[in-house]
Design a protein with these regions (language model features):
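Short, aromatic-enriched amphipathic alpha-helices that serve as compact interaction elements
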Residues: 41-57, 67, 71
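Short solvent-exposed beta->alpha transition segments
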Residues: 59-113
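TPR-adjacent "capping" and linker segments in tetratricopeptide-repeat scaffold/adaptor proteins
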Residues: 36-38
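Boundary at the C-terminal end of the N-terminal hydrophobic targeting segment
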Residues: 29-31
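Exposed beta-sheet edge and beta->alpha loop/turn motif
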Residues: 108-164
Length: 164
């Protein structure tokens, strides 16, 4: 009986160690970014970007900006990149209201075969509303991004009003 109790306790200790290590790994693992694929629709692209920017530093610092970069059209990346420069641009006066905003709405304005335009309204953390035009295009060149919807343009923000 003593051997049974002894091995039972060893088993419990072993399971506790495995559980502890699993929790530590999950807590420290960097979240994988959603990669563009041809099954993600234009509206979803904009929502993925906005949800990520809404919680920019979760689970890691600048994760939202990095997620947004993933869905930037290669031509847009050439104009706004590399990634470190893109991060500075988003954190600058023109787009800082997107970071850690409180709420957003996305409304379809125009949809064509290869280009879709949305009006995005964002409520920033100071409770001011801003409006953007957000355009996505279907990538037509061969390669891993073929037929993926990617952001080609986000307008400068137009301040609307305070929510208070």
């Amino acid at each position: 009986m003593k051997k049974f109790v002894k091995y039972f306790l060893y088993g419990l200790i072993y399971l506790a160690i495995i559980f502890f290590l699993a929790v530590m790994f999950i807590a420290t693992a960097k979240a994988d970014l959603v990669k563009p694929n041809n099954s993600i629709e234009p509206y979803q692209v904009v929502k993925i970007q906005l949800r990520s920017l809404k919680q920019n530093d979760k689970p890691t610092k600048n994760n939202g900006i990095e997620q947004t970069w993933e869905f930037a059209h290669p031509n847009n990346q050439k104009n706004t990149g590399p990634l470190d420069r893109f991060k500075l641009m988003i954190k600058g006066k023109s787009y800082e209201m997107l970071l850690n905003h409180l709420d957003h709405q996305v409304v379809l304005i125009n949809s064509e075969e290869l280009v879709v335009l949305f009006e995005v309204t964002v409520l920033d953390k100071t409770k001011t509303y801003y409006k953007f035009n957000w355009q996505v295009e279907k990538y037509t060149k061969n390669g891993p991004l073929k037929d993926c919807w990617l952001t080609t343009m986000v307008s400068s923000p137009t301040p609307l009003s305070s929510s208070i």
